[in-house]
A protein has these predicted regions:
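N-terminal, charge-rich interaction modules
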Residues: 1-52, 56
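Glycine/small-residue-rich interface belts in oligomeric ring/scaffold proteins
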Residues: 53-74
């Protein structure tokens, strides 16, 4: 199993880091992405084309999107 976590806010990035760490502790391959300003250590900056990352992994990778609820429901 492979998991990709994409976070969009500073708080979401911190949450994604904790979730990703748990996945990795359980032996699950997990990669976190965030805006460049929030990227550090194991958190990579968003790729130039995030849609391509999602397209390539669709059906084989589990994606977790962490963002503000106001953004998600609009």
């Amino acid at each position: 199993m492979k998991v990709v976590i994409l976070s969009f806010t500073q708080a979401g990035t911190r949450l994604g880091e904790r979730i990703g760490s748990q996945f990795r502790n359980e032996g699950i391959t997990c990669q976190n992405y965030a805006p460049a300003g929030y990227a550090f250590a194991d958190i990579l900056p968003f790729p130039d084309n995030p849609k391509e990352l999602i397209r390539e992994g669709w059906g084989e990778t589990s994606f977790l999107f962490i963002g503000a609820v106001g953004i998600a429901v609009r």
